[in-house]
């Protein structure tokens, strides 16, 4: 199975470290800023995994992240790093 990984970027430079590390496992990675992607676009992409990056602020400041976790978290594995992990807890 070819993995299709979505990284939701919460405006943090560490996002591209995640991109590089994950790229060693799977070349199929797309990165979108938390305010530049919609739930519909995520559904279209049909990701096998979602990574939610670190970022400044609080989960409520993380754009679409909480909505995405609520909608897709039951059937798509989601990894949250720092703010992303907090967003999982908030959702």
Swiss-Prot record:
The yes or no answer to whether the keyword Aminoacyl-tRNA synthetase is present is: no
Q: Which GO terms describe its biological process?
A: L-tryptophan biosynthetic process
Active-site residue list:
82
Q: What keywords would UniProt list here?
A: Amino-acid biosynthesis, Aromatic amino acid biosynthesis, Glutamine amidotransferase, Lyase, Tryptophan biosynthesis
Q: Which residues bind L-glutamine?
A: 55-57, 86
Residues in Glutamine amidotransferase type-1 domain copies: 4-91
What's the catalysed reaction? chorismate + L-glutamine = anthranilate + pyruvate + L-glutamate + H(+)
Q: Enumerate the PROSITE patterns for this protein.
A: GATASE_TYPE_1
GO CC annotations on file: cytosol
Q: Which domain of life is it from?
A: Bacteria
Hey, which pathway is this one from?
A: Amino-acid biosynthesis; L-tryptophan biosynthesis; L-tryptophan from chorismate: step 1/5
| Residues forming coiled coils | none
**Which EC number(s) does the record attach to this protein?**
4.1.3.27
Q: Which GO terms describe its molecular function?
A: anthranilate synthase activity
Q: How does it assemble?
A: Heterotetramer consisting of two non-identical subunits: a beta subunit (TrpG) and a large alpha subunit (TrpE).
| Its job | Part of a heterotetrameric complex that catalyzes the two-step biosynthesis of anthranilate, an intermediate in the biosynthesis of L-tryptophan. In the first step, the glutamine-binding beta subunit (TrpG) of anthranilate synthase (AS) provides the glutamine amidotransferase activity which generates ammonia as a substrate that, along with chorismate, is used in the second step, catalyzed by the large alpha subunit of AS (TrpE) to produce anthranilate. In the absence of TrpG, TrpE can synthesize anthranilate directly from chorismate and high concentrations of ammonia.
- UniProt protein name: Anthranilate synthase component 2
Q: What is the lineage of its organism?
A: Bacteria, Bacillati, Bacillota, Clostridia, Eubacteriales
């Amino acid at each position: 199975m070819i993995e299709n990984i979505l990284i939701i970027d919460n405006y943090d430079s560490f996002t591209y470290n995640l991109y590089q590390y994950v790229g060693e496992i799977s070349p199929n990675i797309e990165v979108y800023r938390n305010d530049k992607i919609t739930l519909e676009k995520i559904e279209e992409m049909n990701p096998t995994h979602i990574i939610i990056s670190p970022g400044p602020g609080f989960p409520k400041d993380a754009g679409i992240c909480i909505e995405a976790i609520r909608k897709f978290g039951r059937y798509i594995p989601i990894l949250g790093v720092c703010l992303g992990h907090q967003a999982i807890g908030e959702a």
